[in-house]
Swiss-Prot record:
<dbReference type="InterPro" id="IPR036791">
    <property type="entry name" value="Ribosomal_bL9_C_sf"/>
</dbReference>
<dbReference type="GO" id="GO:0019843">
    <property type="term" value="F:rRNA binding"/>
</dbReference>
<feature type="compositionally biased region" description="Acidic residues">
    <location>
        <begin position="211"/>
        <end position="220"/>
    </location>
</feature>
<dbReference type="InterPro" id="IPR020070">
    <property type="entry name" value="Ribosomal_bL9_N"/>
</dbReference>
<comment type="similarity">
    <text>Belongs to the bacterial ribosomal protein bL9 family.</text>
</comment>
<dbReference type="Pfam" id="PF03948">
    <property type="entry name" value="Ribosomal_L9_C"/>
</dbReference>
<keyword id="KW-0687">Ribonucleoprotein</keyword>
<keyword id="KW-0699">rRNA-binding</keyword>
<dbReference type="InterPro" id="IPR000244">
    <property type="entry name" value="Ribosomal_bL9"/>
</dbReference>
<keyword id="KW-0694">RNA-binding</keyword>
<dbReference type="InterPro" id="IPR020069">
    <property type="entry name" value="Ribosomal_bL9_C"/>
</dbReference>
<feature type="compositionally biased region" description="Low complexity">
    <location>
        <begin position="167"/>
        <end position="184"/>
    </location>
</feature>
<dbReference type="InterPro" id="IPR036935">
    <property type="entry name" value="Ribosomal_bL9_N_sf"/>
</dbReference>
<dbReference type="GO" id="GO:0003735">
    <property type="term" value="F:structural constituent of ribosome"/>
</dbReference>
<dbReference type="InterPro" id="IPR009027">
    <property type="entry name" value="Ribosomal_bL9/RNase_H1_N"/>
</dbReference>
<feature type="region of interest" description="Disordered">
    <location>
        <begin position="167"/>
        <end position="220"/>
    </location>
</feature>
<dbReference type="GO" id="GO:1990904">
    <property type="term" value="C:ribonucleoprotein complex"/>
</dbReference>
């Protein structure tokens, strides 16, 4: 096992600035990819001096990954594959296929960053995972269809769903505004004050009546 200092976060291994022990083959990959340096005495001393800078850089990369995740969430991921009438593919969709699709859309996503929860051997809708950062994995929807006409129907269906969701949100917002305006313009309830006034009047009348009765009573 070799000790390396991680220059960036690596999922399942550690965060930027941490020292990790890995097999020689994996160490060579990390070193070549610029994700780690050898944990020599000099490098460890240098790490202690630059740890704050490394953490700042990691936070910056995480923020960038969050932006990519938001952008990816708005994409319509569709792969066209030949299949039998019952939807069974002639082959399967691989992580390389998804990586190429994302690259064609302008995202630099390597195959090793893509994973599936199941093997994709039929047409349909699937969840796929894309690792954008050691602390961030985006879950996306992938549609696998037989031909371009089906792909277009999927695009229209997604667009329709998005329009319906937007319309529902606008209606809900309008209802909230109307309810707030109605509440602000509601008259103050004076019934309680009126009732108190009537009760006070009745009390005064009863008191006056009792006094009259006492005056009319003959003396004995």
């Amino acid at each position: 096992m070799l000790s390396v200092i991680l220059k960036s976060s690596v999922r399942g291994l550690g965060k930027a600035g941490e020292i990790a022990k890995v097999r020689p083959g994996y160490a060579r990959y990390l070193l070549a990819d610029g994700k780690a340096v050898r944990a020599t005495k000099d490098n460890v001393a240098l790490l202690e001096q630059k740890l704050a800078l490394i953490e700042e850089e990691n936070s910056k990369k995480l923020a960038e990954a969050e932006g990519v995740a938001k952008s990816l969430g708005a994409e319509r991921l569709i792969i066209v594959r030949q299949s039998s009438d019952d939807g069974k593919l002639f082959g399967s969709v691989t992580v390389r296929d998804v990586s190429k699709l994302l690259c064609d859309l302008g995202y630099d996503i390597q195959p090793r960053c893509v994973s599936f929860s199941e093997v994709i051997k039929r047409t349909g809708e699937y969840e796929i995972n894309v690792e954008l950062h050691a602390d961030l994995v985006a879950t996306l929807r992938l549609h696998v269809v037989r031909n371009e006409s089906e792909a277009e129907r999927v695009r229209l269906g997604i667009a329709k769903s998005e329009d319906q969701a937007a319309a529902a949100a606008e209606v809900e917002q309008a209802e909230d505004v109307a309810a707030a305006e109605q509440q602000d313009s509601s008259p103050v309830d004076d019934h309680a004050d009126d009732a108190d006034g009537v009760a006070d009047g009745e009390g005064r009348d009863e008191g006056a009546g009792d006094a009259s009765d006492e005056e009319e009573m003959p003396s004995t």
